[in-house]
């Protein structure tokens, strides 16, 4: 491809609304173009990388015994009502009506459609197992699209669904997909982690996320350096600090003028934060909830949402707190009525806590769960963090940032039961099909590759997913010798099947080098009068600072050998 014919332009300035590195570099390199919030066009360079990622995915899916199909994006809302997932997805679903006033949605995922197909085409144990996948656009009305391709409203996704006759069959499908996903990321040249995850609105009994490690990732990965445990922070469990049990003391009200934050109250009363209780207020499907936790811990809203089994959970606004009769900054469950109280199990681990007196400017000393208040629900609703104790060994948690690029779920039978997707066994007994689902974000994978592979100058593409393998930088192309040499190398490489972007533009060396670094093509060949006078071509890998002069008569062989070694991942 000649750069002079390439559709798209690079830009020097960092777009003001681009927060993540990948968003900045995708826009600056001209690889994507925004149409509206969370909706992007893939320009030719990015689309070449997308196609390479899709091809790697297809190869690994096919190797794992999967069959590719295509399902409709347009779905009747009735199948979402039948599955019971219309409410959990909530406003994320794009709703529309056709000319006959029928309610439809744009598919955010395809569990409903594939289960409907399974109910029609799988009848016997002889029809099992089945593994079916597609690579297709999905639509989700994200409230805050951000991060370029990280969180968008239209995105490309590979979704695969497994159908098995037994839990052991599901385990086999699940493990096969786990290994296939790891192979995809390895072949794309990326470092990934597999971590425990929350199933969210998809549902199911178990799930794992695949994270591409990147400093600017939107997810927090909690892991133990001493053992193999790793989880998304929203799912992670940890060993909470044990407090000594004391003889219960009488409640005592004390004045705490102007002290509202836990740290301020603890300092004012000369106690440790772990000896206090804090209250956080939420609205769960429109109902006011007080969550109570030890002062040295924070609420994990995903755990709280799962415990409450609600579709919508958010922090209560000031007006809602006042309407509930709660005094923010001095609140506790002591003496409150007609309010749902949810407590973290840490409140049972300790005694004689400091908590709010439900009066502005006052707190209570010697508050004890069971004696002074009772929780309507009690469970682990605490957020794990760096420094938390590992529950599986004596290690201490560390943390990394990451970008989620894949999520796999053991769905079980809850969808097949709702759709009547049953099979008969060898004895003629009917059973619901056991399902799994496996998603992989293709556009996210592209963005995550950049988050993990870049420097201050631009993108550094791994060879397997680079839009082009070689960037030929021709300098002073008005010189006939330079032009002839550049054209000859370009033609020879293309004849060998090498993917080449030939910068044939009449621009300065500085502009060309800047664009080469920004676009991040893995291998750059610079052909100039000075290099040719020395009998060679400047050969430089994008990830290296050093370059070398390679003789003209061996440059093609050197390029082929380098591409092979860089692609064998």
Curated annotation (Swiss-Prot):
One GO term of the biological process aspect: prolyl-tRNA aminoacylation
GO MF entry, a single one: ATP binding
Alphabetically ordered keywords of this record: Aminoacyl-tRNA synthetase, ATP-binding, Cytoplasm, Ligase, Nucleotide-binding, Protein biosynthesis
Any one of the GO CC terms: cytosol
Subcellular localization: Cytoplasm
Coiled coil: none
UniProt xrefs under SUPFAM superfamilies: Class II aaRS ABD-related, Class II aaRS and biotin synthetases, YbaK/ProRS associated domain
Principal location: cytoplasm
EC number(s) reported in the record: 6.1.1.15
Tagged with keyword Aminoacyl-tRNA synthetase: yes
Xref: CDD domains: ProRS-INS, ProRS_anticodon_short, ProRS_core_prok
Catalytic activity: tRNA(Pro) + L-proline + ATP = L-prolyl-tRNA(Pro) + AMP + diphosphate
Domain note: Consists of three domains: the N-terminal catalytic domain, the editing domain and the C-terminal anticodon-binding domain.
Function (record text): Catalyzes the attachment of proline to tRNA(Pro) in a two-step reaction: proline is first activated by ATP to form Pro-AMP and then transferred to the acceptor end of tRNA(Pro). As ProRS can inadvertently accommodate and process non-cognate amino acids such as alanine and cysteine, to avoid such errors it has two additional distinct editing activities against alanine. One activity is designated as 'pretransfer' editing and involves the tRNA(Pro)-independent hydrolysis of activated Ala-AMP.
PANTHER family in UniProt: MITOCHONDRIAL RIBOSOME PROTEIN L39/PROLYL-TRNA LIGASE FAMILY MEMBER (PTHR42753), PROLINE--TRNA LIGASE (PTHR42753:SF2)
Assembly with partners or alone: Homodimer.
Family: Belongs to the class-II aminoacyl-tRNA synthetase family. ProS type 1 subfamily.
HAMAP family xref list: Pro_tRNA_synth_type1
Name listed for the protein in its UniProt record: Proline--tRNA ligase
